[in-house]
Amino acid sequence: MARMKLNARMSTGGKAPRKQLAYKAVRKAAPPTIGVKLPNSYRPGDQTVCKPAPPTDGVKEPHRYRPGKMGLREIRKYKKNARFFISKLPFHRLVRKITQNLKAHLRFQSTAMPAPEEVSEAYLVKLFEDAIHAKRVTLVPKDIQLARCIGGVLA
């Protein structure tokens, strides 16, 4: 069967808007409702009372994640990279302050500082891993004390 040639039509910019049904127009014009469901058989003559939405003044509420989700996300993030969690300069100041109490005028080479940093960080990470149990989101001091007792270091 041979194809017929069609004449090109001039575009009008889309379809003409369809007429809305009365109940749809009323539903769109009504203020937004909270917690009140409109019945399926809504008719314009019905006397349904809808609560108006509280004024938000254009301020959007921040998104909240479930408890513990952000913590697990941070754990995964920090497991991927190989840098220290403890800031370098505050840790170096703390080490110098502690060593000044033991022996005055003690100096450190810059290459010697990563060693105590790595050891202390490994100890803290292990302690926190042991302290997290029972699917808790918050670490409680008694959990850390228990982890220290089990690990061999007295509280």
Swiss-Prot record:
InterPro entries: Histone-fold (IPR009072), Histone_H2A/H2B/H3 (IPR007125), Histone_H3/CENP-A (IPR000164). Its main location: nucleus. Pollen specific. Pfam families: Histone. It comes from the Eukaryota. Residues 34-59 are annotated as: Disordered. GO terms for cellular component: nucleosome; nucleus. GO terms for molecular function: DNA binding; protein heterodimerization activity; structural constituent of chromatin. SMART domains: H3. CDD domains: HFD_H3 (cd22911). Keywords: Chromosome, DNA-binding, Nucleosome core, Nucleus. It is found in: Nucleus; Chromosome. PANTHER family: HISTONE H3. Core component of nucleosome. Nucleosomes wrap and compact DNA into chromatin, limiting DNA accessibility to the cellular machineries which require DNA as a template. Histones thereby play a central role in transcription regulation, DNA repair, DNA replication and chromosomal stability. DNA accessibility is regulated via a complex set of post-translational modifications of histones, also called histone code, and nucleosome remodeling. The nucleosome is a histone octamer containing two molecules each of H2A, H2B, H3 and H4 assembled in one H3-H4 heterotetramer and two H2A-H2B heterodimers. The octamer wraps approximately 147 bp of DNA. Belongs to the histone H3 family. This is Histone H3-like 3. The gene is leH3.
